[in-house]
């Protein structure tokens, strides 16, 4: 009788240096986390000892164990029987065999994998079960440069911080901020920036979260200046979303700052001041938006002593912004409290999607 490729021998005692990860492995096996992938992602490859999904699973375990690539499978996973046994594997495929399975994947396989990942997210996430009637769903959208070898798929020259002339790719991400859950990850070539990636990322998030028109009306999309153009914001508004963004145009930012007569010191940052307020949708200097927006001018003292100016744009009511930052919605009539709430709400991007990128790169 052929031995199954999963299901460790309960009579064998083993030890591992990855005890906490082994516990996670037992739990993931209980959840049958890879079930949708096993059922929905057929890979045209002959099975000798391990099925294609078995080999994908080995690659997944190796990544959880800290591997930076499939080349580390032999050293990190294959040499640790207790660890792969905890994940339900009786043995581990050799790294070159796992790589062959990756090479056998096609564009159709990628689409099938995305559908399977959607099924996994919906089955186990809080973001998918969010109650839109009780509160706002917050989605952060951002990009991060991922340097790589020049032979890697989609590798092109692009912008990578502190690494000039380095080939790489851009990772686009949508994060369900309240739950610290990655809703969508998509890989783009090294030249792609958020202004180009915004549309496919948002549409993918709509698919994963099953966002109909009513849910989109209760969803706040938060983006930086890379997608803060009038056309980008209007596209989101046309889809029915609320938006919190930083204006892409320095000309509009300078124009608004020149109109501010009362700059208020930011109590959280002594080098920053805030000013601004509601702007009608038909204000040509603000940009022709599809609905009334609030624009808050923010200036920060730079190292050369001059002011750096930015503008935060938001479609939320002040009471909603105050509530989202833990303030009192009754302060919505206070211009200073409202302006500060919008700025603080934008600042929280740094504790959301930007933090997830840093954690990914630090391991």
Protein language model annotation of sequence segments:
Residues 2, 242-359:
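An anionic, glycine-rich sequence signature occurring as long contiguous blocks
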Residues 1-167, 171-193, 198-207, 211-214:
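Dynamic "connector" segments at or just before major functional cores
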Residues 83, 146-148, 181, 191-192, ...:
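Flexible loop/turn segments at secondary-structure boundaries
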Residues 194-254:
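Domain-level cores of phosphate- or acyl-group-handling catalytic modules
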Residues 76-80, 104, 201-208, 235, ...:
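Generic, well-ordered alpha-helical scaffold segments in large soluble proteins
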Residues 117, 142-144, 224-226, 248, ...:
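Anionic group-transfer/hydrolysis microenvironments
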Residues 53-54, 65, 225-228, 338-341:
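Short, glycine/acidic-rich beta->alpha junctions
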Residues 153-158, 235-241, 258-263:
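Short secondary-structure boundary/capping segments
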């Amino acid at each position: 009788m052929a031995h199954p490729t999963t299901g460790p021998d309960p009579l064998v005692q083993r030890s591992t240096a990855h005890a906490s990860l082994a516990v996670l492995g037992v739990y993931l096996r209980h959840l049958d986390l890879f079930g949708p992938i096993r059922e929905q992602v057929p890979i045209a490859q002959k099975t000798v000892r391990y099925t294609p999904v078995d080999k994908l699973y080995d690659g997944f375990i190796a990544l959880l164990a800290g591997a930076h690539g499939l080349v580390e499978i032999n050293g990190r996973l294959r040499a640790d029987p207790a660890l792969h046994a905890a994940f339900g594997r009786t043995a581990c495929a050799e790294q070159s065999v796992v790589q062959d399975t990756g090479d056998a994947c096609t564009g159709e396989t990628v689409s099938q994998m995305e559908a399977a990942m959607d099924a996994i997210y919906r089955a186990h996430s809080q973001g998918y079960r969010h109650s839109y009637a009780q509160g706002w769903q917050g989605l952060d959208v951002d990009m991060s440069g991922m340097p790589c070898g020049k032979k890697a798929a989609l590798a092109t020259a692009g912008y990578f911080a502190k690494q000039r002339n380095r080939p790489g790719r851009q990772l686009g991400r949508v994060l369900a901020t309240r739950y610290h859950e990655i809703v969508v990850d998509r890989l783009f070539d090294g030249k792609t920036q958020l202004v180009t990636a915004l549309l496919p990322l948002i549409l993918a998030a709509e698919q994963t979260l099953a966002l109909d028109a009513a849910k989109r009306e209760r969803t706040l999309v938060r983006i930086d200046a890379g997608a803060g153009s009038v056309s980008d914001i209007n596209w989101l508004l046309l889809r029915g979303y609320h938006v919190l963004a930083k204006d892409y145009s320095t000309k509009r930012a300078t124009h608004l700052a020149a109109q501010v007569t009362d700059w208020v010191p930011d109590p959280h940052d002594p080098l920053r001041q805030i000013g601004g307020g509601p702007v009608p949708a038909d204000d040509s200097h603000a940009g022709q938006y599809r609905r009334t927006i609030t624009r808050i001018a923010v200036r920060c003292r730079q190292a050369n002593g001059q002011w750096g100016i930015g503008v935060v744009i938001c479609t939320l009511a002040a009471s909603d912004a105050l509530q989202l930052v833990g303030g009192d919605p009754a302060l919505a009539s206070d211009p200073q409290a409202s302006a500060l709430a919008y700025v603080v709400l934008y600042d929280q991007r740094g504790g959301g999607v930007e933090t997830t990128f840093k954690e990914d790169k630090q391991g």
